[in-house]
Amino acid sequence: MTTLHILGFPRVGAKRELKFAQERYWRKELAEQDLLDLAKALREKNWLHQAQADADFVTVGDFTFYDHILDLQVATGAIPARFGFDSQTLSLDQYFQLARGNKEQFAIEMTKWFDTNYHYLVPEFQKNTTFKANPTHYVNQIREAKAAGHQVKPVIVGPLTFLWLGKEKGEAFNRFDLLKQLVPIYFEILTALAAEGVEWIQIDEPALALDLPQEWLAAYQDVYAQLAKVNAKLLLATYFGSVAEHADLLKALPVDGLHLDLVRAPEQLSAFEDYPKVLSAGVIDGRNIWRANLNRVLDVLEPLKAKFNQRLWIAPSCSLLHTPYDLAVETQLQQNNPELYRWLAFTLQKVAELQVLKQALNAGRDAVTEQLNDSQTAADARANSNVIHKAEVAQRLANLPANADKRQSPFAERIKLQNKWLNLPLLPTTNIGSFPQTLEIRHARAAFKKGELSLADYEAAMKKEIEFVVRKQEELDLDVLVHGEGERNDMVEYFGELLDGFAFTKFGWVQSYGSRCVKPPVIYGDVTRPEPMTVRWSQYAQSLTDKVMKGMLTGPVTILQWSFVRNDIPRSTVCKQIGVALSDEVLDLEKAGIKVIQIDEPAIREGLPLKRADWDAYLQWAGEAFRLSYMGVKDDTQIHTHMCYSEFNDILPAIAGLDADVITIETSRSDMELLTAFADFKYPNDIGPGVYDIHSPRVPTAGEIEHLLRKALKVIPKERLWVNPDCGLKTRGWKETIEQLQVMVEVTKKLRAELAE
């Protein structure tokens, strides 16, 4: 018989029940016991869904109140010493303080979990870190599930991935040196799990899909030789990429089974067809929301079944944490877009797909004819749908002129033309894009969406807000103005709602971090722009002032990265389609007299593949898609872009290759360190390093901004330097925003006068 198991389940519930309970608990509106009871009910529901789908085990240890890597920091005693907490007796309140900070200590840093849109809390390792086992989190969940009558498989992230994901703090050392102390602690934790009578323990080592240094790879053999002494079988799970280059290493490891991601890297299967133990085939996509073509999946699985027999397990490619909970609650989508609805599968539907596959492998395809026919019909409909495939989009991409993604003239010539009409002072000041969104604005948007506010009243509310934002900027004496983006709920969703080829769910939430969830748009078809999206707002804003108004768009790579993307054509093609659609908007803005246009790309870096060897291909198509978004603009139109993150050094040639006339970047928190990379690289175009951190309500002193600007002037010629905040101001309040910008403008004017002398 084929074994069915799940690597992990979403934690937040079908309608974000956990999120709302957590937030009520933090506001002291919910008792701790009530939060614990709700969490238990959610776990029981998750286990029941797995059991009802004929899973051979239910997975435990995957549920967390905030983050599974934070749970591991507690379980190994590796919580940051700076908090002064005892990991053995940690309270729920203290646990949340680690994640959210308190009056004395800032929160543990967050970063992206591999190349997903989930964030984990980065372990802080010090030279003198001492580990201490506390398996309570896992043991309690095992007991809970067993008490409910389930067969149980606990999951824990492995020691090498855990160490790799952390950062060294304090005195310089290599965190790899902590491995020999960490492994006995893992042994202690696994021994406690085995003592609960579990047959299998799943140990996740996704770091194997990265370019790990040789000494880290070499350590796997010894680490797992020690862990294999535990009185339970070990399933080593890899995902997010191919581990084929480590096939010899993995075959020799003393574990009892291996999980492979055959969705992200189907080609790696050939390297493991002689694997002598349990092979878990990750055949259902754990990171996207499309139904699988089950006949095609069986074409892969049936030969494996013949070869591996009882040793074949089936599973999703990775944890289902990255997919929404249940398609069945999307009644609105089912009514409005029944065709698209039939092509989708959320977590519960994916579990059901695995159940069908298990039945087919155990009893033959005839046992599930109806389900297989239904799957095939949906796949065929999707392949041939004219809702998805638009001949004119494919033609337009195929017939782009040879240098469609190149400006007419090089930057040195363009900037002269731009400066001539812009007539800006030295060190021009601007804002990144958004201004604070008041409750009033949010209410107006929501009421309009629900049909409670007429179009005329909605437009009046937005125009009133735009005028307010423009007047405030004039009072502050900023040089290049923005309209404030009051009409936008989210920088991707706003454009997705106005572009063809996108759809939206009502409950398609996935966890981003802690209680924060995001609802990505669904890109299901060829992308086009049926009509202008931003022109009237920017045009209205420009009509209110003689100062230069900047148009604001979200770039193609960011729209791609923050959406669920169709899987029937390459991501690169989808990205170029978005770029071409945006170019229509850019040209319409230009025609309307908006000749400074910003195309934001905060997500270009996070799209980088996990393996370095794949970077160039990605950066090439991502860069092309970005340049296509402004194709055809005149030389005297100034294109800006904005990026927010701290690591640029390794992709600077690609950033320069975007050929934006002005790039604004987040630099204040790193004390302008980032700029040295731009200077060493001799970055050729204009640059606006952020001079204060917008993530805090604190108003910077004149001295702080002056210090940063003087640092910037040391490495960037004054003629090419812009002055701006780090990021958009949407999440700030108006009071601190005005005060922050006042300081920024005053310091700029002081330095301007000095430079003029």
Curated annotation (Swiss-Prot):
Pathway: Amino-acid biosynthesis; L-methionine biosynthesis via de novo pathway; L-methionine from L-homocysteine (MetE route): step 1/1. Disulfide bonds: none annotated. 5-methyltetrahydropteroyltri-L-glutamate binds at R16, E17, L18, K19, K112, R516, C517, W562, E606. Keywords: Amino-acid biosynthesis, Metal-binding, Methionine biosynthesis, Methyltransferase, Repeat, Transferase, Zinc. GO terms for biological process: methionine biosynthetic process; methylation. Its cofactor is Zn(2+). L-methionine binds at I432, G433, S434, E485, D600. Zn(2+) binds at H642, C644, E666, C727. HAMAP family: Meth_synth. Catalyzes the transfer of a methyl group from 5-methyltetrahydrofolate to homocysteine resulting in methionine formation. This is 5-methyltetrahydropteroyltriglutamate--homocysteine methyltransferase. It comes from Actinobacillus pleuropneumoniae serotype 5b (strain L20).
